[in-house]
């Protein structure tokens, strides 16, 4: 009787340990930053990090704080920022994206979620970031682009812009570009590529489509 009781107690203890095992989950996040004061958590201000923390706490019942790869500024958008968090929740890693999207505002969408190594850190990993800056170069601005592109009237010398971009390639100290009090370990960054691309708009101000509607329907099997 005593031996069996000890065995059951050990099995129960093992089950508790397995249940509370901590996992690190990676989120790929897209968002429209116009309604937020940047990524980083701030008191009495709406931020991307704050919304993610709130949704995760509501979902798991745990006090969770995410760690992001890029702490974007106010009004900055992202197509695939990366964040991680630790949890003891038993929700399958790939299901977090679906569950969180039910709890997040419509301008923040989790594109994917997966489990990563416990020591993975989005700001310390050997990875590259891609930034895109859009310039709306035409006679009049377009309201549809007011939050996603910088309006510039006048003719741009594209070839001169491309030549100037070459000066930024390689490793440089970007301390002069940082805001006062920026908390970073180093201001040295390496630029691997920098391209200027022209994308024409139609007279109506919409991008020239790469494929017609008929081609899209064909791809959908219609």
Please tell me what each predicted stretch does:
Residues 5-8, 12-222:
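Structured-RNA-binding interfaces characteristic of tRNA pseudouridine synthases
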